[in-house]
Amino acid sequence: MKHYRIFSFILLFICAAFGQSCSISSSGREVLDMNTDWAFYRGDVVEGSRTDLDDSGWIPVALPHIMQLEMKHCGGNSIYDGIGWYRRYFKLPAKYKDKRIVVSFEGVMTNCDVYLNGQKVTEHHGGYMGFVADLTNRIDWNGNNVLAVRVSAEPDPLTPPGKPQDKMDFYYYSGIYRDVRMVITDKVYITDPLQEDIVAGGGQFVTYPEVTKDKARAHLATHVRNLTDKDQTLSVFSQLVDSAGHVIAEAETPVTLHKQSDRTVEQDLFVNQPALWHPYTPNLYTLRTQLLSEDKVLDETTRKIGIRTIRYTAEEGFFINGEKLYMRGANRHQAFANVGDAASNSMQVRDVIDLKRGGYNAVRAAHYPNDPAFLEACDRYGLLVVECIPGWQFYNPDSIFIERLYEIGRQMIRRDRNHPSVVLWETALNESRYPVSLAKEIFELSHAEYPGDQMYTAGDYFGHAEMEPYYDVFYKQVSKFPKDGDVMSNYPEDFIVVKPLFTREWGDGVGEKPRVSLKESEEEQMRQCRSRIEQLNGKGYFDWCMLDANPHMGGHFVWSYNDYARGSQDETMYSGVVDINRYPKFSYFMLQSMRDKAVSQPGLYEGPMVFIASYNASGDFASSTTDITVFSNCDEVRLYRNEKLIGTQTREERTPLFRSIVEKGGSPMFVFNAGEYETGTLKAEALVDGKIVATHSVSTPGKADRLVVDIKTDGIVPVADGSDMIPVYFKVCDKNGSLIYNSGQEIRILVSGEGVLVGDTISRIGINPQKVEGGVGFAFVRTTKKAGKITVKATAEGLFAGEAEISTKPFEGKSSLPDGKHALFTGKEEDNVVVKPSSWQKRILEKPRLKIASVQVGSSQDGYPASNIIDNDDHTWWIAGEDRLPQVVTLMLDRPTYVAASRILFQKDSSSYKHKVETSEDGERWELLYERECTGWEFKPMTVDREVKYLRLTIENVSEGRAGLGEISLY
């Protein structure tokens, strides 16, 4: 036995040294990749699980997979939300006959039924958590096996989040969109927490009861199960290995496991001078646990762990390893262009890298549990995570919805409790109205699942004050609506310290320019930056709690990291600091400048940065002439135009304008007056202690001359597994390589070698050919199963072609489940495609608005007049001048007019408004049109279909704040 352990350790060390994921053949556990060789059918199939079904016309696909590729800008509930079937053939050798065989699904959206050889194995509800299908006693050992999965993306109010997609601010999308693996173990094994139903148990749970800089104790609770009819005399052997491959702690515990029984084995590992995990020093250890029987390894698991301790205080915020850390975070949606949520693990990693380079030390996984690969990357690169139960502006009192929510909450904690990056668990249904009993139950089950002082739950205070006992950390800690009714007022006396304070979302919905597309000008991008830096400095929406200006603020999360499509509106949500393709806007660099210049992570980023927020393209914009903004986290910035010094500014000089930001460790903006515009080159130098530590130059773009193909690697070598994805940008540039930022050029793409262009030849989704946006195009290339070179070429009329190459590496260190015997799958991606017709709402919005003669209200807050209701601007508001309800708003037309529809946009997107709408032809006799309660996000047109001279809106109740409107439009 000792010799075997030494051999295993040596092999583990070799694997760690060369960055490989190794499989020890005698470990008793085999994990087989199942991401390739699937057949897919879009639509429902009678008895689609039959082994003798003719599936030759089905579409050959690889996972991750969305049931229908979509346009990049696919808002307005235009995506596929129906049924789909998947089939995977395989044959297993007889050596596995006495083994436990399960298939692990990381994510299937939304509900699914799993079959093997025509027999139902299990069903699962909810697309954001994985599950296990046990095939142990169902395998056909004499021939082919057919694993079939019926997936439903149809609306389901009983499965959280539950809200229909046409009312959602994001999309669920569809399909088997995360990894699938077959796991083969002995029938005496270490369990999977998602298969077991044990509070704070199943699998392995690692906690750290003692953590100091001098020593730490890791407590292991390993759950083992015996499926045999024989008692087993065993031992559990655990080793902790550092990054250099040295075993620094180990423990062996004997255990007797009776037949058909299970047990949790507890062990302690002691570490001297531990390398603690921290966002800026994300030290990880390898924990390997073996289940031993005499000289045989029955099972083995290996995981990365990080030793750290956290605490939150109401007065000072967040502490990690005893040191205070201010969280600067972003909200991230997991969706990508064309493929929705179905992106490979490498794309999850790239998002983490991009967030870290963008100056963030934290991310809010809004509004659902993210991909395991994303969390593993957060552990590896050092990104704190707020993990959320799935929910958004919806609560269903049905007991099925509630029980599924509880189960998802339990499973989320069991899956992710060992991640050092996860430091806050958002157990509130985001922006929803729900009973105190629900908050109490989720709070109690969360602390039961993660006992001790390292579990912190989070929710909103304002609007939920009665739930104070059931959250450990609060967002929105304000005592009341602003006393003057101005939602952009910030009165320090209104801010309270009930619990530790964070702001979950800021930066969208209010301000000079909260949303901007890369198709817009540099000046529009700068408007977004100016808006957000003012908000950071304390001049934001009242329930953002003044952000950096609040002395009790522990951190905040900008909305949002990335642009994304949503069901509630046709237009893409342009709130991101990067677009859907992850191409950065100016605001990416503004927030990057908030990071500490003294903190660098080797191989990831260097601390000092400088960025000129200008295309230097036109004298029409102040951002190229009199207000050239430079973002930097350094002490001093010099700006040159054509080698002539425009000026020098210091951090100290700029601090008075941005004092709150600077006091929280952030940076001011540096704004230079360059006078008259000149073509040429702007160059910025950033200095620390008088030395230049970073530079950035921007040259005036000339005439479009060429295409540049930019394969975004981020140091990641793509894997030839038939499943990996590579992001590629296509830039329209002048002869010197400067981006033509306003180009909408049509380009064509050719991929050759060992890669495939995702969505090639599908004109419906506009990938090839495609029109670039803001001078930049984008596409995914998927790898084949053969390692080799991939060449990506782009052409456009009148421009020199661009070309780039990348090589893939073999799929080593892991095994794939071999394909079974079946007919050739001949289906095409567009078979049975579902193109939703232009919605009635969209057609209505394309009509001209009717002129409204006048509007009357009961009261108005200063600065928010009634005229804002009918000024054709959604971003100007009417707010009632008093808290009294109801508030009545009456519109009058010049004469009785046929009105097809009305569109009512309420002032606050997260508040719920109970209201009724009536119409009249004479102002005396009123006819009820409808009564409803909705949030500010639900602003699609409603049918009127009658003659109207007067329309009366009565706002009867508001969940948070006063009655308010953005706009009322009639069509």
Segments predicted by a language model, with ranges:
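Extended carbohydrate-recognition surfaces in non-catalytic/accessory domains of CAZymes
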Residues: 23-106, 160-167, 173-176, 186-188, ...
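Trp- and acidic/polar-enriched beta-sheet ligand-binding modules for extracellular glycan
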Residues: 882-885, 908-971
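Active-site-adjacent substrate/metal-binding segments within catalytic domains
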Residues: 65-92, 96-105, 109-116, 122-125, ...
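Accessory beta-strand-rich segments of carbohydrate-active enzymes
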Residues: 32, 44, 81-196, 227, ...
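Substrate-binding/catalytic cleft of secreted carbohydrate-active enzymes
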Residues: 352-354, 362-591, 605-611, 618, ...
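Beta-strand-rich structural segments
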Residues: 220-223, 290, 614, 628-632, ...
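Accessory carbohydrate-binding/adhesion or oligomerization-edge regions at the termini
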Residues: 20-71, 150, 154-159, 175-177, ...
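Disordered, acidic Ser/Thr/Pro-rich linker "stalks" and the adjacent N-terminal cap
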Residues: 27, 55-63, 116, 827-895, ...
